[in-house]
């Protein structure tokens, strides 16, 4: 695939039967043994993902914490060293520039993990807003590879090849300099699947060895490599949002039900705070809802949502859920039609199919929160 970037793991995909696609300008595997098989593997056992296409940046310096707080909607000040926080980075109108993870190493050192499709945009945004803050910002994406190992057996398997007790790494916590198969890595108990699991950051030259070591460690338990197809169905079932689908620069966190990650009472200003305060006071005019298709069909991103002949919104993500075996979706609709139990239609291939609004938390599984 000419002109596309590759990750340090590009050479291993075919060994495992990977089918390669263009994703965010990278050659990445959409599936290995089939996305349904891979989806169930992560729900029931453990699966390994190459997520080295994600972006990473460091923010260091005397004003690092103040600067990161200025960029983010969540309360960075509550973070302790070696903790991770999910947050939004918004524009002045409250629209989402990106959703990302903030890793705190120390008060003067933070590590940001950003979406692959937004890497260049995010780094430019961060640099453009540096102002007089005493910080150094470095895009370190090309010097880091990232693997995600997710599923109920992930801890048990990974424990075989690490030098620390993984139970000490609690949910949304991190540990640096963990030896994974003898290689120094940053390991956090985070993920994008709705299952327990870990994200592992390593040197690019160590990625292939770690990939093979993790899969070999989990051979008896049935660990498998997982492609982008299952990654999307897994995150969707867990109602984890995808940039470009559920959010973009014209959609605010409040509209998609993510107000918990917007701390309007923090003393410090952050970009978009005034707009979000105003929106909260006035009330949102549209909301993200879950829905189940009652007629036979599969909803897809961009399909119209219709009520009494009027377009009231659009589908942001839709699938036949592998876990629930139902055609379900997320849709951004006018606020008055967002109540659970509201009936509307989804336009699927020129036909209007019946649907009903349901709780968008389609699937929940306990992760290790303590």
Curated annotation (Swiss-Prot):
It catalyses: N(6)-[(R)-S(8)-aminomethyldihydrolipoyl]-L-lysyl-[protein] + (6S)-5,6,7,8-tetrahydrofolate = N(6)-[(R)-dihydrolipoyl]-L-lysyl-[protein] + (6R)-5,10-methylene-5,6,7,8-tetrahydrofolate + NH4(+). The gene is gcvT. Belongs to the GcvT family. It is an enzyme of class 2 (transferase). It comes from the Bacteria. Keywords: Aminotransferase, Transferase. This is Aminomethyltransferase. The glycine cleavage system is composed of four proteins: P, T, L and H. GO terms for biological process: glycine decarboxylation via glycine cleavage system. The glycine cleavage system catalyzes the degradation of glycine. GO terms for molecular function: aminomethyltransferase activity; transaminase activity. Its EC number is 2.1.2.10. GO terms for cellular component: cytosol; glycine cleavage complex. Transmembrane segments: none annotated. NCBIfam families: gcvT, PRK00389.1. SUPFAM superfamilies: Aminomethyltransferase beta-barrel domain, Folate-binding domain.
């Amino acid at each position: 695939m000419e002109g596309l970037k590759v990750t340090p793991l590009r050479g291993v995909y075919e060994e495992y039967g990977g089918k390669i696609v263009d994703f965010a300008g990278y050659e990445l595997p959409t599936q290995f043994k089939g996305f349904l098989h891979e989806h169930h593997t992560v729900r029931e056992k453990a699966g390994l993902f190459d997520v080295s296409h994600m972006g990473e940046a460091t923010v260091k310096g005397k004003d690092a914490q103040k600067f990161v707080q200025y960029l983010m909607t969540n309360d960075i000040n509550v973070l302790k060293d070696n903790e991770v926080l999910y947050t939004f980075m918004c524009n002045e109108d409250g629209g989402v520039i990106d959703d990302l993870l903030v890793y705190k190493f120390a008060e003067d050192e933070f590590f940001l993990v950003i979406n692959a499709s937004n890497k260049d945009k995010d780094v430019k945004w961060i640099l453009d807003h540096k102002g007089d803050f005493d910080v150094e910002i470095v895009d370190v994406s090309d010097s880091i590879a990232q693997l995600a190992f997710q599923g109920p057996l992930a801890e048990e398997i990974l424990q075989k090849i690490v030098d620390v007790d993984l139970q000490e790494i609690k949910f949304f916590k991190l540990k640096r300099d963990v030896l994974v198969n003898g290689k120094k890595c940053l390991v956090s108990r985070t993920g994008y699947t709705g299952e327990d699991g870990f994200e592992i950051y390593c040197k690019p030259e160590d990625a292939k060895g770690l990939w093979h070591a993790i899969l070999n460690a989990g051979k008896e338990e049935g660990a498998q490599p997982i492609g982008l197809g299952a990654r999307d169905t897994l995150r969707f079932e867990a109602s984890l949002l995808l940039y470009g689908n559920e959010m973009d620069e014209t959609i605010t966190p409040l509209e998609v039900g993510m107000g918990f990650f917007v701390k309007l009472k923090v003393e410090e200003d952050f970009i978009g705070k005034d707009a979000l305060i105003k929106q909260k006071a006035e009330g949102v005019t549209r909301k993200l809802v879950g829905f189940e298709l009652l007629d036979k069909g599969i909803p897809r991103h961009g399909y119209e949502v219709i009520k009494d002949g009027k377009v009231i919104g659009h589908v942001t993500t839709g699938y036949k859920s592998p876990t629930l075996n139902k055609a379900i979706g997320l849709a951004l609709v006018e606020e008055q039609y967002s109540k659970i139990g509201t009936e509307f239609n989804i336009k699927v291939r020129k036909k209007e199919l019946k649907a009903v609004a349901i709780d968008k938390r389609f699937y929940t599984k306990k992760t290790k929160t303590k």
